């Protein structure tokens, strides 16, 4: 198949040693060669034997995937080790390895666990509640948790006899998924009394070490007390997170300092435990957001520096509401069609919001990963996603983009018992992986200049002074007047988040005075015209219209509102289409520029929808689902013309390919390519 990218992967994962970190990048330890990961969360639960996994691995390699994040519990409903899960994970690693795909292991998520009322080592739960935060302070839980890792990493495979501990195809491990002391779930309503008493006693002990006594601590706080404060038992309670990051009292600062130290120590001790087992792969702490991106966000990231790289999660959602809308799409649900290329708010009737998961500052010269991300269904603009991630991931020199979720290896609208909003195996998503994976993995878009260097003083962060560049914090268009206009950032100002669409940002945590070195962004960002140009000159975004133009030597194209864009003249090609929403991109397959390449892929996509899906308009920006639809997927008929400018364009043969990348017939030459309504890929050769 002309779209088969298996050749990008190693002969087998680990061929060049374990994945390591050097100079802020992932590298092959044996060669020192940098590597980026275009990845998926998966495989799904459909595979029950090695053959299923091997077929899935071959499919993923074809579409440019070189890493899977296998997100699966290794424990049963009581928190005891499940040996079958260990065997399944081993089978996944072995199958992926054969196709040059690494595996990243994620085995604990609080939402997978609901301790029963009489649980022997997690007291106080009711069989319905999740143990948020408990892993970070409960020693019995930590001992059990470490037993899970010991069993998973040291049990020999029944197939190969190898331990995962010794397997270079294991990219790394994640300490915990989506939990933090600084997220809203850390609240007395979510933590039972028996567990609160444990951590309140720890806080009391911490305060005694700092102040000499609890009386002295309360005096330093002007005597303010909470109902749960019990000094006679050495216990001190916690104010709600909202109060901490808004009121920033002396008590709040002490509380945050204690929680930060406890969370960081948990990560440090877990890393030490895993290294003590002999684990040679990478370790990351967690990936969660916080109740305050401005105040708690940088502290969360600072706690993650105990690991080898910094991870995060982020979804581009679509105002989806209804019963169980957090994990399913059902009749009666409502949603909005929302364009990321226009920075539309979840409700597009509201002002633009300049926030997106692709925004990726690098912390402490460590690699970055986004281990869960997607544009959620049923948004018609979902087809913007693959090129958006690839282009801006490459511009910011992001190290790993892990799409959520590969929930089945068939092109089905409903892979499981319900229709979910993250399904990756769709024409608009996986169908655009060939060109997107090439752009990202091969660096066909150059990294941008470093436009901001931010030094955050650790003591200031613990003093709740925050950061001028909060990650995952929405800034609406009405606030753009408040961003710095030159190179000076005044206290309280936010750096323009559009900086991420122009170049790179580095953040360091320091002991010396904090500072911000900011480039003048006026040559890249034009708020009046609503445009952003990359510092490389290869990318331009017209966010007023919703059009992305890519003009790099080895990758050129246009994405978004093609009809509104009109004829688009790029360096080596000309594109014209009346599609309201479309994505047309050419990439070279021989590492030569478009101007001289002898082998190119032209990839075309518009929007997808399920057959028989029906909606009704609730208001101008909100729709209600009448019928979620059925198989098969449909793609809007494609339309347009692509002309290559090079002198030998008429000598370049153009072959239309089917959906699997196999030739179906000649369609002339590259002097003028009239797009066929049902063709997504064209091979251009000489």
Where would I find each of the regions flagged by the language model?
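Long, low-hydrophobicity ectodomains and other hydrophilic envelope-associated domains
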Residues: 437, 446-648, 652-656, 677
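Catalytic-core region of carbohydrate-active enzymes that cleave or remodel glycosidic bonds
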Residues: 154, 263-283, 290-291, 298-317, ...
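Non-catalytic propeptide/linker segments at domain boundaries
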Residues: 1-15
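C-terminal beta-strand-rich structural cap/linker in extracellular carbohydrate-active enzymes
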Residues: 671-686
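Generic recognition of flexible, low-complexity loop/linker segments
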Residues: 159-161, 258, 270-273, 296-300, ...
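Surface-exposed loop/edge segments in extracytoplasmic proteins
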Residues: 661-669
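Active-site mouth of glycoside hydrolases
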Residues: 13-307, 319
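Flexible internal linker/loop segments at domain or repeat junctions
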Residues: 319-337, 616-624
């Amino acid at each position: 198949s002309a779209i088969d990218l298996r050749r990008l992967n190693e002969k087998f994962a680990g061929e060049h040693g374990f994945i390591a970190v050097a100079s802020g990048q992932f590298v092959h330890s044996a060669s020192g060669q940098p590597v980026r990961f275009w990845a998926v969360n998966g495989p799904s639960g459909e595979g029950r034997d090695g053959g299923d996994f091997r077929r899935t691995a071959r499919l993923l390699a074809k579409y440019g995937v070189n890493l899977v994040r296998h997100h699966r519990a290794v424990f049963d409903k009581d928190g005891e080790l499940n040996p079958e899960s260990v065997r399944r994970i081993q089978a996944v690693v072995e199958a992926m390895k054969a196709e040059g795909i690494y595996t990243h292991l994620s085995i604990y998520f609080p939402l997978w666990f609901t301790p029963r009322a009489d649980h022997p080592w997690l007291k106080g739960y009711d069989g319905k509640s999740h143990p948020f935060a408990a892993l970070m302070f409960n020693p019995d839980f930590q001992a059990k948790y470490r037993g899970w890792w010991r069993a998973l990493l040291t049990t020999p495979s029944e197939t190969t006899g190898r331990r995962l501990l010794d397997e270079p195809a294991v990219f790394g491990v994640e300490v915990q998924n989506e939990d933090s002391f600084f997220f809203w779930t850390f609240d007395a309503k979510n933590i039972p009394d028996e567990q609160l008493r444990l951590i309140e006693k720890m806080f009391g002990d911490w305060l005694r070490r700092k102040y000499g006594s609890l009386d002295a601590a309360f005096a330093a706080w002007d005597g303010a007390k909470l109902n749960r404060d019990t000094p006679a038992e050495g216990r001190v309670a916690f104010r709600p997170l909202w109060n901490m990051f808004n009121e920033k009292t002396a008590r709040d600062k002490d509380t945050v300092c204690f929680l930060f130290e406890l969370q960081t120590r948990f990560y440090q001790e877990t890393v030490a435990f895993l290294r003590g087992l002999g684990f040679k792969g990478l370790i990351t702490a967690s990936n969660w957001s916080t109740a305050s991106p401005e105040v708690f966000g940088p502290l969360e990231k600072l706690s993650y520096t105990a690991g080898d790289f910094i991870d995060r999660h982020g979804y581009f959602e679509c105002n989806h509401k209804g019963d169980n809308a957090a994990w399913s799409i059902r009749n009666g649900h409502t949603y909005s069609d929302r364009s990321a290329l226009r920075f539309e708010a979840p409700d597009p009737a509201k002002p633009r919001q300049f926030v997106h998961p692709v925004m990726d500052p690098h912390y402490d010269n460590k690699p970055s990963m986004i281990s869960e991300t997607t544009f959620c269904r049923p948004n018609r603009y979902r087809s913007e996603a693959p090129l958006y991630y690839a282009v801006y991931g490459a511009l910011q020199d992001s190290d790993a983009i892990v799409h959520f979720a590969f929930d089945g290896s068939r092109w089905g609208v409903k892979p499981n018992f319900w229709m979910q909003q993250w399904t990756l195996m769709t024409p608009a998503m996986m169908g655009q992986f060939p060109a997107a994976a090439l752009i990202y993995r091969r660096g066909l878009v150059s990294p941008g200049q470093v436009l901001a260097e931010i030094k955050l003083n650790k003591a200031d962060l613990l003093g709740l002074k925050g950061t001028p560049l909060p990650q995952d914090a929405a800034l609406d268009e009405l606030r753009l007047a408040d961003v710095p206009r030159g190179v000076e950032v005044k206290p309280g100002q936010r750096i323009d988040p559009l900086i991420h669409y122009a170049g790179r940002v580095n953040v360091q945590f320091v002991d010396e005075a904090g500072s911000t070195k900011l480039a003048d962004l006026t040559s890249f960002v034009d708020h009046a015209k609503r445009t952003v140009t990359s510092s490389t000159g290869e990318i331009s975004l017209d966010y007023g219209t919703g059009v992305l133009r890519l003009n790099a030597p080895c990758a050129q194209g246009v994405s978004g509102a093609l009809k509104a864009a009109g004829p688009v003249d790029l360096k080596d090609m000309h594109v014209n289409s009346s599609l309201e929403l479309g994505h047309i991109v050419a990439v070279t397959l021989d590492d030569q520029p478009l101007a001289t390449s002898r082998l190119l892929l032209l990839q075309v996509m518009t929007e997808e929808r399920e057959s028989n899906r029906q909606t009704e308009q609730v208001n101008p920006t909100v729709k209600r689902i009448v019928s979620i639809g059925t198989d098969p997927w449909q793609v809007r008929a494609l339309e347009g013309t692509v002309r290559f400018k090079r002198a030998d364009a008429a000598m370049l043969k153009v072959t239309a390919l089917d959906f699997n990348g196999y030739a179906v017939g000649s369609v002339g030459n590259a002097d003028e390519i009239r797009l066929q309504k049902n063709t997504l890929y064209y091979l251009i050769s000489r």
